[in-house]
């Protein structure tokens, strides 16, 4: 393949992956915010921004709508779209580039081929995280910035820029990267399973009449997303709880310290708070990966691999 052809395919991968991600993430913003509120509620109670725990997904929706209005469900979505566009675009674009480096073919053995897919997916996700972590931090702080404890009260942050300004003033650059190490581990586990399993299972399951089926592709993507997100969810909780301590007097000494203290004070179940909402949110992730494949088939008559 010529250099021009490779660059053209790379640009198509980058654009289509990013657009699909941005659209899906915006559609899933309400459940995304509910997930973050439930996940971080114990930290929010400590900080005085939440007066009592949420009893479930529906109750969280009701309370948030009553206290903050329906539009508040998209709080933090701007940062999420800005973050998610390059994250997914880079993942989709570099996934195949990195996979090509391993040079494993299915004929060489399924286990070796599967391991190559797993490694390439994890590495692609880990690399993209280096560039967008501070946006993920800002999105988390905005989404978890509730004012339900005091109706009509002031929020901690007025917007994306304000998150950066206040965090840099109180904690410096380190504050924007709090929870980064467990994030790296989590992103490798999640993305490795996300891309690795999808690429490995797709040619086995989506064959014959199911090969170009949007529903079949969507269901496979949802199943893979659900499994990957559940497996890495405790790491996600630890990193976000660490993020919430930036600007606070008391902080965790590290990921292990956060894990130990959360389990000791709240029980192991606390690591999975919001997991139900996260599974529902996985519909968006499944939509992204299936839309990516379907758009390529519709526009170009094939997928770019």
Curated annotation (Swiss-Prot):
Segments for region (Important for transport activity): 239-244
Keywords for the protein's UniProt record, in alphabetical order: Antiport, Membrane, Mitochondrion, Mitochondrion inner membrane, Repeat, Transmembrane, Transmembrane helix, Transport
GO molecular function, one term: ATP:ADP antiporter activity
Transmembrane segments: 10-37, 78-102, 110-130, 180-201, 215-235, 275-295
Domain of life of the native organism: Eukaryota
Disulfide bridge positions per record: none
Catalytic activity: ADP(in) + ATP(out) = ADP(out) + ATP(in)
Mode of membrane association: Multi-pass membrane protein
Coiled-coil region list: none
Keyword Membrane: yes
Location of the protein in the cell: Mitochondrion inner membrane
Keyword Transport: yes
Record's comment describing the protein's domains: The transmembrane helices are not perpendicular to the plane of the membrane, but cross the membrane at an angle. Odd-numbered transmembrane helices exhibit a sharp kink, due to the presence of a conserved proline residue.
Assembly description: Monomer.
Name of the protein: ADP,ATP carrier protein
Organism: Kluyveromyces lactis (strain ATCC 8585 / CBS 2359 / DSM 70799 / NBRC 1267 / NRRL Y-1140 / WM37) (Yeast)
Organism lineage: Eukaryota, Fungi, Dikarya, Ascomycota, Saccharomycotina
């Amino acid at each position: 393949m010529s250099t021009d052809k490779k660059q053209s395919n790379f640009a198509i991968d980058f654009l289509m992956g990013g657009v699909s991600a941005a659209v899906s993430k915006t559609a899933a913003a309400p459940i995304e915010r509910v997930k973050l509120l439930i996940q971080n509620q114990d930290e929010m109670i400590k900080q005085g921004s939440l007066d009592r725990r949420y009893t479930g997904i529906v109750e969280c929706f009701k309370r948030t709508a009553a206290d903050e209005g329906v539009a508040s469900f998209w709080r933090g979505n701007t940062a999420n779209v800005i973050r998610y566009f390059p994250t997914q675009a880079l993942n989709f674009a570099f996934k195949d580039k990195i996979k090509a480096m391993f040079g494993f073919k299915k004929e060489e053995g399924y286990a070796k081929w599967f391991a190559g897919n797993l490694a390439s997916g994890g590495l692609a996700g880990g690399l993209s995280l280096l560039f967008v972590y501070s946006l993920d931090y800002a999105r988390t702080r905005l989404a978890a910035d509730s004012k339900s404890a005091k109706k009509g009260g002031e929020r901690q942050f007025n917007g994306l820029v304000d998150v950066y300004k206040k965090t840099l003033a109180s904690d410096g650059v380190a504050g924007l990267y709090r929870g980064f190490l467990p994030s790296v581990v989590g992103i490798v586990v999640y993305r490795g399973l996300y891309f690795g399993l999808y690429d490995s299972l797709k040619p086995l399951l989506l064959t014959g009449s199911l090969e170009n089926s949007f529903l079949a592709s969507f269901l496979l993507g949802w199943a893979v997303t659900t499994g990957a997100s559940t497996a890495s969810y405790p790491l996600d909780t630890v990193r976000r709880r660490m993020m919430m301590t930036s600007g606070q007097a008391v902080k965790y000494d590290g990921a292990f310290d956060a894990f130990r203290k959360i389990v000791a004070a709240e029980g192991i179940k606390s690591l999975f708070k919001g997991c139900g909402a996260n599974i529902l949110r996985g519909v968006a992730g499944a939509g992204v990966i299936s839309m990516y494949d379907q758009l390529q088939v519709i526009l170009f008559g094939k997928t770019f691999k």
